[in-house]
From Swiss-Prot:
Gene expressing this chain: hslV
Protein name in the entry: ATP-dependent protease subunit HslV
Disulfide cross-links: none
Subunit details: A double ring-shaped homohexamer of HslV is capped on each side by a ring-shaped HslU homohexamer. The assembly of the HslU/HslV complex is dependent on binding of ATP.
EC number(s) reported in the record: 3.4.25.2
C-alpha cells in the first residue's frame, strides 16, 4: 500500500506519549490540496490519541469503528485494537480499506496495519505514512541520545521528515498524554 501525503509519528517515554501528524493532503501524486488537515485526534474521554494515514474516507471508517471498540471495552486500548483487527481481517469490506493507524494511551503505542495486524514497537517509537521511515529514524536517534520530552522528539522528527519527504509538510498537530503519577 503506497501511502502518500501524510506522516504520523508517536513516541513513548517514561513520562507519557506524544503523537504528531503533518497537515498535508495530496491528490494523486503531485498536487497538495490542503495543508492544515487534522490527522491526529483525541478520543475516549481524551485518554487515547489516534493518528491515521492512507485514504481519508477509509481512515475515518476505521476511526469510527475503533472509537466504538474503545467504548465497548471501557477504554482498554490493547483489547479494542485486537478486536478491531479481528473485524478488519474477517470483514470483506474492511479488508479493502487502505489506511493505517497509530493508537496510543499514556503507556502504550500500537500500529494497526492495513492488513489487520496489531504491532507494539519494542522501543515505543512508531511511524507510518510516506515520511514514516525518516520520522522513525530521527525519533529513535533523539530518544536514545537526548533528554528531550516525547513532544519535543516528535516535533523535531516531523521537521526532519518534512525536509526529506515531499508528501509531508511542517503544519503539525501534536497531542500528548502524560502517565498518571
Amino acid at each position: 500500500m503506497q501511502l502518500r501525503g501524510t506522516t504520523i509519528v508517536a513516541v513513548r517515554t517514561e513520562a507519557g506519549v506524544a503523537v504528531a501528524g503533518d497537515g498535508q493532503v495530496t491528490l494523486g501524486q503531485a498536487i497538495a490540496v490542503k495543508h492544515t488537515a487534522r490527522k491526529v485526534r483525541r478520543m475516549y474521554k481524551d485518554k487515547v490519541v489516534i493518528g491515521f494515514a492512507g485514504a481519508t474516507a477509509d481512515a475515518f471508517t476505521l476511526f469510527e469503528r475503533f472509537e466504538a471498540k474503545l467504548e465497548e471495552f471501557g477504554g482498554n486500548l490493547v483489547r479494542a485494537s485486537v478486536e478491531l483487527a479481528k473485524d478488519w481481517r474477517k470483514d470483506k469490506y474492511l479488508r479493502r480499506l487502505e489506511a493505517m493507524m497509530i493508537v496510543a494511551d499514556a503507556g502504550n503505542v500500537l500500529i494497526l496495519s492495513g492488513t489487520g495486524d496489531v504491532i507494539e514497537p519494542d522501543d515505543g517509537v512508531a511511524a507510518i505514512g510516506s515520511g514514516g521511515p525518516y520520522a522513525m529514524a530521527a525519533a529513535r536517534a533523539l530518544l536514545r541520545n537526548t533528554e528531550l520530552s516525547a513532544r519535543e522528539i516528535v516535533e523535531k522528527s516531523m521537521a526532519i521528515a518534512a525536509e526529506m519527504c515531499v508528501y509531508t509538510n511542517d503544519q503539525l498537530v501534536v497531542e500528548t498524554l502524560e502517565k498518571p503519577a
